[in-house]
Amino acid sequence: LQADRAPTITAESALLIDQESGTILYEKNAKEKIYPASVTKIITALVVMDYLQPDEIITVGTEINEVTLDSSKAGHVLNEKLTVENALRGLLIPSGNDSANVLAAATARKAENDEDMSFAKCEAVFTDLMNKKAEELGAVNSHFTNAHGYHDENHYSCAYDMALFAMAFMQNETLAEIISEKSFSGNGADGQFADDPEAITQDYNWVSHNYLVTDNEYQYAYATGIKTGFTDEAGECLTASAEKGDMKLISVLFKGSDPARWTESASLLDYGFNNYARVELTAAGAAIEEVPLTKHNKLQGDTVPLVYQNALVTYLPTDAVNSVETAVTILDDYKVEEKDGTVKVKAPLTKGEEIATVTYTIDGKEVAQMPAYAGADIEKGTIFN
């Protein structure tokens, strides 16, 4: 249910969601195909974290020579040693395509247990992992052919999918910390090889490309990340995150322009914070209502409580929070309708058995739906009870 007063968005594709529940607060062409450019690196980082530990040391290979001259680069050199965490910084802060290749190679070789794998094979293995990860996260219109997002006609995504990836990304403490950083200055290997004259390491000074995070006229006070992108084909792109009070939001803009990607992202986030409220419709284990029984052991009473197993949290327009209506629908396998129209639940029942669906609506529009469960064991009735 969308609140009024949505901002004007000139980007071709956009989405605003709650970071924790995935509730969509605004959308524009959210499932249409776009080219993601360097925003790709969100899912690249997710795949890396599935296989590598942040403190692992990796060694830079010839994969850094496989990026185009006009790519954004972190500045790695052949045989350099650095931690996975700092390679991720190189990927996410200066948006290094060289970092993407280094991480893809290390991940693929570990996944396949083959340290001698060529980079061509590494890229094929890694992009297969990216596509599997996208499917696992519920993507509907994504396909990846490289780890960095440099344009390829067969490398695409959509705002909806990227929001799913961003939600998973922000759940990872290491990644969430990295993309909140305005800059990074330090040794790529965290000084671990200071006493080894043979080891190659580098000191870096990287500055985030995300103007919502850094100190400038477009800085957004509540911004916490995430990733920028640009190619001629993709336009100016930004997937942003922000936190204010008890709300955490993610905005996604594709095929936009500068400086509109900064101002429109801020406007979208403000729209979410100012016009929606976080509402817990019910707590985990809470009883919804008592429903009448039939064909049951009357010694156990004539009703059974309907309960939720999980909390139901959503975001609603602030002016509609008090207009929520609830409807309980008993599942057909348990439903008995009496002659007077009364709906009852037939025994036997096992505690925790799903027996109903609860639908929440505002002005007839569905805003949430949850399964409901029997809150007690109920025996079948006999001639003795």
Language model regions located:
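Active-site-adjacent loops and short helices of periplasmic peptidoglycan-processing enzymes
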Residues: 1-160, 164, 169-173
